[in-house]
């Protein structure tokens, strides 16, 4: 009798171990970009729910904070993020006469950005105008935008490559490299949570060359300008069947000469879908 009980326990233990091994993915198992994409789309909502939110308006409050290299105080103000199909608008009104707003829009054809009272573009406006294809291709704004590139990726003539896991703020994220003939010198990486597959971070590295000379009789020399823009998305909430981030943070670093950095942080509090949006909304000056 004792021998039968012992054999039963051994058999039961073997079954438990076998089940545990079958349920645990192999550590060396590599995901594909297609698998990450499929799971990411499911994290947003059903195709039916997403289709009902092709017109979106998000309203909230934001702040602009100088992090390095800029002299000035933190600015605050109201924020609006609107989109319909591929059209997009991002506006942050700020409490400063010298730096009154951030404005960027895309009407399906042209990217426009607001200008400062001096006639110059803001650092963010300059970056987005120079690297306008991240807006035209639907990458900027991530899942906040109805034109998010991953919603209709097959039609974008672009490529995704799975680049493994990467540490970010003490957590591991799935990394996808995005490439397209339209992105030029831009290096674009997209990051996703390992458990929910929500898109939580985009990184854009942009390098451009300027011809510089202090003497018109001499040949100009090339000087590189390197920029990095990071978008962060968090505080996800289900709104009318779609899961969207309520907190949106942009961080722009300019590595020319001395490193400078600015941060725009937004907290959305109101979401409106099915709004009728005028075409004029998606052009700013």
Predicted regions and their residues:
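Bacterial Sec-dependent signal peptides at the C-terminal "C-region" and cleavage site
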Residues: 16-26
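Short amphipathic beta-strand/extended segments with alternating polar/hydrophobic composition
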Residues: 73-76, 103-108, 120-132, 216, ...
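Positively charged n-region of N-terminal signal peptides that target proteins for export
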Residues: 1-4, 21
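Gly/Pro-enriched, hydrophobic low-complexity segments
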Residues: 20, 165-284
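Flexible, processing/modification-adjacent segments and terminal tails
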Residues: 24, 28-35, 42, 110-186, ...
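N-terminal mature ectodomain segment of secretory-pathway/periplasmic proteins
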Residues: 39-120, 154-164
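Bacterial N-terminal signal peptides
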Residues: 7-17
């Amino acid at each position: 009798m004792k021998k039968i009980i012992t054999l039963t326990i051994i058999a039961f233990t073997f079954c438990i171990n076998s089940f545990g091994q079958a349920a645990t993915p192999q550590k060396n198992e590599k995901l594909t970009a297609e698998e990450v994409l499929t799971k990411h789309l499911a994290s947003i909502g059903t195709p039916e729910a997403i289709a009902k939110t092709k017109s979106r308006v998000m309203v909230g409050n934001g702040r602009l904070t100088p992090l390095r290299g800029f002299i000035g105080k933190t600015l605050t103000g109201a924020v609006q993020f609107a989109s319909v199909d591929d059209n997009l608008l991002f506006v942050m009104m700020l409490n400063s006469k010298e730096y009154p707003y951030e404005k960027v829009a895309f009407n399906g054809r042209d990217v426009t950005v607001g200008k400062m009272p001096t006639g110059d573009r803001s650092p963010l406006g300059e970056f987005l105008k120079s690297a306008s294809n991240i807006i035209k291709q639907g990458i900027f704004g991530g899942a906040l935008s109805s034109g998010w590139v991953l919603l209709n990726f097959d039609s974008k003539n672009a490529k995704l490559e799975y680049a493994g896991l990467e540490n970010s703020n003490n957590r591991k994220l799935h990394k996808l490299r995005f490439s397209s003939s339209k992105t030029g010198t831009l290096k674009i990486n997209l990051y996703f949570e390992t458990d929910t597959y929500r898109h939580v971070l985009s990184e854009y590295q942009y390098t451009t060359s300027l011809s510089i000379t202090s003497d018109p009789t001499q040949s100009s020399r090339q000087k590189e300008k390197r920029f990095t823009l990071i978008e962060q998305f968090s505080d996800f909430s289900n709104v009318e069947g779609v899961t969207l981030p309520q907190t949106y943070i942009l961080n722009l670093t300019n590595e020319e000469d001395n490193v400078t950095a600015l941060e725009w942080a937004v907290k959305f509090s109101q979401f409106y879908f099915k709004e009728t949006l005028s075409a004029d909304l998606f052009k700013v000056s």
